[in-house]
Amino acid sequence: MSKDVIEYSKLFAKLXNTNDDTKLDDTIASFLYYMFPRELFIRAISLLESSDMFIYILDRVHNKEGNEHTSLIDVLVDEFYKGSSNSLLEYRLIVKDTNDGAPPILVDIAHWFCSCEEFCKYFHEALEKTDEKEELHDVLINEVDDHLQFSDDRFAQLDPHSLSKQWYFKFDKXCCSHLLAFSILLRSSINVLKFFTVNSNKVFVIAIDNIDEWLNLHINIVE
């Protein structure tokens, strides 16, 4: 699965059915199923349809009048798809753990991290297989400094705003359904984002305009 050949984010973008905005494209979904191990893609889609995924946005200036939900989606579109956000958006990607009493799962696609057991397991396995002479950076990150080799793919991309280099986390070393699900949502297309947040209303976008509530969100994650 070479980054030079496959642009995953473009494949994710085709998941939304162009003829019916209430359905996913079965052909693209079937193709993606075989591109990830451990039924990872199926688990990611199931997660997107589970109503257990949340995007919390620290909202200091949001106008509470009118359609708040649509406005929040516009904020996400500006941040992840148009790059037109005037300020750094503070947000958290959270998944409700289905195990009773377990803390919420924190997902960070910008730095390719997830607090779930699956990600930690494969991350540590990658570390154990690392030769003592190898740098961790070389083991887990693919660095591209040749502009001719640059890719438009945004899946597992780190620091996408750099103009001199591209970095991709080697997701075949460590990936989980949570990272894949949020990547499908936020590293694909506006249509896919709206499919899960607006059309099917399975992923919830929630504004927090109180700093105390924002801090409590983080406390609940680490407890």
Curated annotation (Swiss-Prot):
Its main location: nucleus. GO terms for cellular component: nucleus. It is found in: Nucleus. Keywords: DNA damage, DNA recombination, DNA repair, Nucleus. One of its GO terms (biological process) is DNA recombination. Component of the SHU complex composed of at least CSM2, PSY3, SHU1 and SHU2. Belongs to the SHU2 family. Plays a role in a RAD51/RAD54-dependent homologous recombination repair (HRR) pathway to repair MMS-induced lesions during S-phase. Required for error-free repair of spontaneous and induced DNA lesions to protect the genome from mutation. This is Suppressor of hydroxyurea sensitivity protein 2. It comes from Saccharomyces cerevisiae (strain Lalvin QA23). The gene is SHU2.
